[in-house]
Amino acid sequence: MALDRNIFSVPNNERSIDSFKARLVSGGARPNLFEVEMDFPSGVGIFDDEIENTTHRMMIKGAQLPASNIAEVIVPFRGRQLKVAGDRRFDPWTITVVNDGDFKLRTAFERWANYIIKVSDGSGTINPTEYFSNWTVNQLGRAATNLAETGKSSGATLPILRRYSMKGCWPSAVSAIDLNYDTQDTIEEFQVTLQVQWWEAYDASNTGSVV
């Protein structure tokens, strides 16, 4: 195989920190700039209106942008292994929730789980379309500023850089909250594991899936 000599012809200034800075669009995406849009099934009946839903988005302090997984199929051939594409796999999606004093979100997830299978007798809704719902995680960008004019952000809304719509979610686990006399300077939080059928990704324009 011939050596590509073009790799030796890259100017030194293309390897500089300034060159790297110019390619780091918007200063890079930040893992602490995100929000989760909630959509509980109507049968759960937890939120009174969209304003309350929007308010409680702030209580979700941890989430993930989903992985893209394709299983491999190994086909043996004369002592070698041919690896071909298998089936898609979608990992469970875990979020971390801050537990505020009214237990609103914990109640919502406990009701959702109870809506699927009741803790008392094992009955529940049998139609998946009634307990599936679509959740969304938004990667946010940093708001643009114009210090010369206002000294403040040019807009109150952080831009959405990427949006992932998690399809057919339902909670398979709502974690325990540990209690202890020794714990100080801490607010309760808990994790929820949501099973996902598939996901779709959208760019900032939100005009169609980018995948």
Indicate where each model-derived feature is located.
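Glycine-rich, low-complexity intrinsically disordered segments
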Residues: 1-211
